[in-house]
Amino acid sequence: MATTDLRSLLDPASLAIADQAIAEVGTDRRTLPVAFPSLPRRVGRERCGTTRVHIDGADVDLAGFRTCDVAAAVVLRATAATDAECLDLWSHGDLDERVMLLRSLHFLPVGPLTVQLFGEVQRTNVVSHLEAAVGDGDLFARTAGRFGFDQAAANRLLLKVAFLDVPLARLFHAERTANAELSRMLQDLATEREAAGRPVWRDTWRLIGRAPCPGSLARLLGGIEHGDDGVRLAAAEGLLAAGRTEFAALAAERLPRESRPAIRALLQQLSARR
């Protein structure tokens, strides 16, 4: 993975605009609520790239970040914006300005502000805000267990991720936070959705395999017979993560009836654990 500098992601014109905003705020901090919202209009909303990079301790996928998001982070970092100033931007910002602030969090030091804004996002159903806060980077994983973002808080946010159907793969390393209580919560949500005839978050099977609770293994076994290819793949990955050997025969029985190469490969690994 490439390592790069945050400022290098901006072209000269955008960087000049960011530096102008930094100078203005440095002269009069009261200009921050004016300079910050103007960034999308002044530097644009184009995507910053298509690669996954490492920037100052953060692991991010540039495909999820816009030029204005990076410019905002440059300004907030250079001006040492306080938590109070950032919360004021949140309180008075529109939907897009809040996205920009949440994207900036990926490049700011993890701290109480991160946790407070995670809480704001968790209490809403705004998909773009959830994606901006925890998607396309490792911010969730870097925050877990710090500054009051304990297991219970992390579980609630991951449950919101499941509720809004954001793919787990967009939260880099979030699978490491799997725990039995989260599995119980995800299974309860899955049961509710199934009863209502609604689709279940596919990553449910991946996470419950890492930290099974009562009912997890039955759900995983049912998953490898599911009609949805994505569910079967996730269930096979979950069974592998569970590390159990007693399901080798069941995997071997399923193998001849599985047509998808990626799922077959996982079933072969499972069946070899006899």
What are these language model-derived features?
Residues 72-77, 87-88, 99-109:
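Contiguous, well-ordered alpha-helical segments that form the cores/surfaces of helical PPI scaffolds
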Residues 85-93, 104, 116-125, 129-133, ...:
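Alpha-solenoid HEAT/Armadillo-like helical repeat scaffolds in large eukaryotic proteins
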